[in-house]
Amino acid sequence: MSKSASRARLLEIIRRRSFGRGEVTLASGRKSDFYFNLKPTMMDPEGATLLAELTYEALKDDGYDYIGGLEMGAVPLAGAIAQISWIKGHPIAAFFVRKKPKEHGARLAIEGLTRDETLAGKRIVVVEDVTTTGGSAMKAVETLREAGAEVSLVFTMVDREEGAAEAFAAAGLSFRALYKAREFL
């Protein structure tokens, strides 16, 4: 399937499985008359594959060492993208950032690394399913930067276009999206 055909097919899947109308309160606290819940698309075999392939194709030439983001939305995305990257011969390892470190066991804030691995000095792309103001992604970015990671890009599946681009620019981050919310409205 061509890139444009894959993109069109994924838009259909997101519209059917993950887009809805009705008043909701977003993670940012804002009210909206439409919403995206990408988890049904991320858990669908075709949807997950298309999300991963299109994201991988957008990132493959940028030289990233790791891909990940804040739990929960980034977990299936990062795993699927890592798998596709290995299949395509250009591995990008995955991780995820906990909203708060575990209070037992190793008490980690960043999961997916071995005891000997570090993100210090590594090129990281933060990925998320839906971005509104950028607050959730910035939590991950802050944790990663504290760990010494070089975070330069936030990549989202759907940008609601409600201030995230400006917030990321102010933090010295590039921002890219597979889709803009207006493509579904």
Curated annotation (Swiss-Prot):
Q: Which residues bind orotate?
A: 132, 160
Q: Which domain of life is it from?
A: Bacteria
Q: Does the keyword Transferase apply?
A: yes
Q: What would be an example GO MF term here?
A: orotate phosphoribosyltransferase activity
Would I find Transferase among this entry's keywords?
Answer: yes
EC annotation from Swiss-Prot or TrEMBL: 2.4.2.10
Q: Which CDD domains match?
A: PRTases_typeI
- Please name the Pfam families in this protein's record: Pribosyltran
Q: Which UniProt keywords apply?
A: Glycosyltransferase, Magnesium, Pyrimidine biosynthesis, Transferase
- State the reactions this protein catalyses: orotidine 5'-phosphate + diphosphate = orotate + 5-phospho-alpha-D-ribose 1-diphosphate
UniProt: 5-phospho-alpha-D-ribose 1-diphosphate binding residues: 98-99, 102, 104, 128-136
Q: What class of enzyme is it?
A: transferase
Pathway(s) it belongs to: Pyrimidine metabolism; UMP biosynthesis via de novo pathway; UMP from orotate: step 1/2
Q: What are the names of the required cofactors? A: Mg(2+)
A GO BP entry: 'de novo' UMP biosynthetic process
Q: Which NCBIfam families match?
A: pyrE
Q: Which family does it belong to?
A: Belongs to the purine/pyrimidine phosphoribosyltransferase family. PyrE subfamily.
Record HAMAP family? PyrE
Quaternary structure (record): Homodimer.
According to its UniProt entry, the function of this protein is described as: Catalyzes the transfer of a ribosyl phosphate group from 5-phosphoribose 1-diphosphate to orotate, leading to the formation of orotidine monophosphate (OMP).
The entry's protein name is: Orotate phosphoribosyltransferase
What broad taxonomic lineage does this protein's source fall under?
A: Bacteria, Pseudomonadati, Pseudomonadota, Alphaproteobacteria, Hyphomicrobiales
Gene name of this polypeptide = pyrE
